[in-house]
Each structure stands twice: as structure tokens, then as C-alpha cells.
């Protein structure tokens, strides 16, 4: 079978070791004689899996006991609605939404159904390079109920790696869908972290929420929030208010164990840095390609790049696919190409992409 490398923004590659284990256990999970796809979510065996999954995630991120872990449906988009519904005290609340790019903006727009958010645009362009403005130019509200932001924008490939100083003593809610588990994160800096699983944690269908318990305790179970989106109800039911996506939970746990086997998030971060440095160097050292993000704000997970000869875009995509490189088409909003280097992408895969880019530029340059 031909070796394929999937650079899609999500669903992404899974580690080979995880795929092999899924294959081995597909018909007989945990020596029960039935598949994980068939087992009851109320069974003792599945409940053990739930506890193991939470424990492994808690260990990976050093999540303190003062935080609850929830496993939810609906992707990150469901949380765009759930967050204001759960945390707003009234429609007059001051809410800050940091507009870092495509996903940060969509979250802010969705919140308008429930409040009047202060949308803070923090990216700008100079000399054809997009960058994040200095924090002194961010118009943060003094008494905001919470601040929402997306630290890594998959579409534009722009990133805020460190938590901004201006967020200190604020309730910070962050969409970590494309970067959670790609590097260490100090959970204590956040009121809530949420992330869809299909990038660095497994397959689609699962969204992980890490929420400070004190925030959950302030939510009423009788508030006018759909029960399936009410964090208090989800916490009280151990994320099983309705039948969960059992397979997604199972695969997430396999990925958590794989990450531990790689040496944890410090080692993963080092490896991800090597991968992204390799690709950025290939782009910057070849006049055939370019990236439009300032070097200080470049994403390590999602790397857009453009051909200076745009008429060759379709040819690049077709030939790269034949080369075993899939999912390189850029997002429809910005075009060009995009290589997503999530945890399961190997250095071998990135090197193969670089080799193809060099080959293509020599052939058509």
C-alpha cells in the first residue's frame, strides 16, 4: 500500500500505532468478544475507559482537581453558543472577544445572539505581512465577564503562543481546537479551554472541555440553556446526559497514551518545532513560494503558503497528490496551499513535502 501523508486541517492523520491498535481491537475490544462500537456506554468496562481517558488527559496537561473535564458533541461551533449561554449573567454584561482571525471572528459573531460583545481586532498587515498588534493596542474591557480568544487560527496560520499579560486576573476562555496537546499549557491561566478532537486528539465527534469547577458551580440547571449544552448538567452526568460518541472517546484515549509514550508534551513540542522549522525554511529560502505571516506570529500547526505563479495552483495540488501528499489545498477564504502539521504528522512526511516543493519549483520555475 502506498504511503500517504495527510496534511488536512482536520480530520487529521492518526498515529500509525493508534491505527494499528484500532485494527487489532476492532472485533474484540478488551477481550469482551464485541467491538468498542457495540458496547454500552453504561457498562462497567466503558466506565473504566471513561475514567482512564480523563486520568490520562489530566496527567498530560497537569490539570488540577479544581478543573472539570467534559466530553461533548457538536464540535467547537456548539461551544460558540454554549459559552455565552452558560456564563452570561445578563445581556448587558461586558464580554470581550479577541478577533485573531477566521474562527475567533465566527465565535464573536455567534455570541451576538446572546449579548453585545466587544470585538477586539488585534491583527494587522504591514509590508504584505500579517501580524499581531502589541498588547498595548488591545482595547480590553475593565470589567469583562470573560475574554474569549483563539490562540491558533487554522485558516490564516497565525498564532499567539503565550497567554497575553493583559489577560491577567480575567476569566479567559480559549478555543484550543488546533493546538491543544501540541505543547504544554498552564491550565490554571484559563477559566475554560475547549478543543475539537479531530486535529491533535483523535477523530471528529468529540469536543473536550476543561472548565474551572467554580465557574460550573455558578450555572443553574434550570437556566434557559438547552440541557445538552448546560455545563452543570453535563458535569453532574459525567458527560453522559445522552449517549456519547463512544468510539471517539476510545480513540482519544489511545492518542493520549501514545502522547505519553512519546515522552509527553515537552517532547511533542520539540518535535513539532522541528517539523514547522523545516517547512518554513523551505518556503522562505525558495523564491517560488511565500508565507504572509510575520515570523513572530507564525503557527506551528497550520502553515499556509502561496505560489507566486497562481496559475500553477491546480497543477501543484494534482502532482502533490500523486506524490502521496494529501490535503494541501488552502482554505477557500485565503486560497493557496496549507500544510497542517498536527502531532501525528511525522518529520518524514514534512521532508517529503519539502522535497516535492523543491522538485516542483525546479520543474516549473
Curated annotation (Swiss-Prot):
One of its GO terms (molecular function) is O-phospho-L-serine:2-oxoglutarate aminotransferase activity. Its EC number is 2.6.1.52. One of its GO terms (cellular component) is cytoplasm. L-glutamate binds at residue 42. HAMAP family: SerC_aminotrans_5 (MF_00160). Catalyzes the reversible conversion of 3-phosphohydroxypyruvate to phosphoserine and of 3-hydroxy-2-oxo-4-phosphonooxybutanoate to phosphohydroxythreonine. This is Phosphoserine aminotransferase. It comes from Blochmanniella floridana. The gene is serC.
Amino acid at each position: 500500500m502506498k504511503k500517504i501523508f495527510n496534511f488536512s486541517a482536520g480530520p487529521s492523520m492518526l498515529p500509525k500505532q493508534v491505527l494499528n491498535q484500532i485494527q487489532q481491537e476492532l472485533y474484540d475490544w478488551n477481550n469482551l468478544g464485541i467491538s468498542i462500537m457495540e458496547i454500552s456506554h453504561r457498562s462497567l468496562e466503558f466506565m473504566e475507559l471513561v475514567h482512564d481517558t480523563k486520568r490520562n488527559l489530566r496527567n498530560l496537561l497537569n490539570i488540577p482537581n479544581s478543573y472539570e473535564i467534559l466530553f461533548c458533541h457538536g464540535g467547537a461551533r456548539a461551544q460558540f453558543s454554549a459559552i455565552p449561554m452558560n456564563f452570561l449573567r445578563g445581556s448587558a454584561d461586558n464580554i470581550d472577544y479577541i478577533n485573531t482571525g477566521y474562527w475567533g471572528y465566527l465565535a464573536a459573531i455567534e455570541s451576538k445572539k446572546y449579548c453585545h460583545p466587544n470585538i477586539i481586532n488585534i491583527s494587522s498587515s504591514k509590508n504584505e505581512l500579517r501580524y499581531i498588534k502589541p498588547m498595548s493596542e488591545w482595547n480590553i474591557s475593565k470589567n469583562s465577564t470573560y475574554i474569549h480568544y483563539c490562540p491558533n487560527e487554522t485558516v490564516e496560520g497565525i498564532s499567539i503562543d503565550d497567554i497575553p499579560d493583559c489577560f491577567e486576573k480575567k476569566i479567559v476562555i480559549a478555543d484550543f481546537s488546533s493546538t491543544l496537546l501540541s505543547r504544554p499549557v498552564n491550565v490554571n491561566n484559563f477559566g475554560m479551554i475547549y478543543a475539537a478532537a479531530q486535529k491533535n486528539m483523535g477523530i471528529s465527534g468529540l469536543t473536550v472541555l476543561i472548565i474551572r469547577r467554580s465557574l460550573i458551580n455558578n450555572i443553574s440547571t434550570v437556566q434557559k440553556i438547552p440541557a445538552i449544552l448546560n455545563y452543570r448538567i453535563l458535569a453532574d452526568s459525567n458527560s453522559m446526559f445522552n449517549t456519547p460518541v463512544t468510539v471517539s472517546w476510545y480513540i482519544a484515549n489511545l492518542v493520549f497514551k501514545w502522547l505519553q509514550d512519546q515522552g509527553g508534551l515537552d517532547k511533542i513540542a520539540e518535535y513539532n518545532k522541528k517539523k514547522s522549522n523545516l517547512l518554513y525554511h523551505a518556503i522562505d529560502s525558495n523564491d517560488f513560494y511565500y508565507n504572509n505571516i510575520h515570523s513572530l506570529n507564525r503557527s506551528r500547526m497550520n502553515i499556509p503558503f502561496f505560489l507566486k505563479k497562481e496559475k500553477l495552483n491546480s497543477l501543484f495540488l494534482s502532482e502533490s497528490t500523486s506524490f502521496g501528499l494529501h490535503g494541501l489545498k488552502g482554505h477557500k477564504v485565503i486560497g493557496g496551499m496549507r500544510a497542517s502539521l498536527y502531532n501525528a504528522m511525522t518529520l518524514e512526511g514534512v521532508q517529503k513535502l519539502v522535497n516535492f516543493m523543491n522538485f516542483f519549483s525546479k520543474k516549473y520555475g
